[in-house]
Amino acid sequence: MRQETQKIMSAFLKGEKASAQRTNTDGNTVWLHGNKIAHRQQDTYDHGLVQFTLAGWPTVTTRERINGMLDVFGYSDFGVIQKNLNQYLVYKGKKVRSVDDREVISLAELDHLRDEMKNSRNTLLV
């Protein structure tokens, strides 16, 4: 994880302000180059109410920031990858489903997917 990502996402986890070269947070929202890529309901520290998006920019940097957030929030078994110019949500390195570059995904949805994957022998793989 890049130092900038670690700094910003650790502050976001704690609900604190932080700024770096390309990314900043007010503790409730994370912006990359001015685009909102993560948000939590104000004054709420329930991880299920945290949401993230590629904000229309499926770049290496956007995916790295999102994956860093997932790691800091304890969701390191999930990630967002690109394959053949398509974005995918992965669980333990396996594609779960495609992701639209403007789609908003919540950590609550990841909790649900994790439970489904653990409780089912059928895979949800794309």
Go through each PLM region and give its residues:
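Terminal leader/tail segments of proteins
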Residues: 1-126
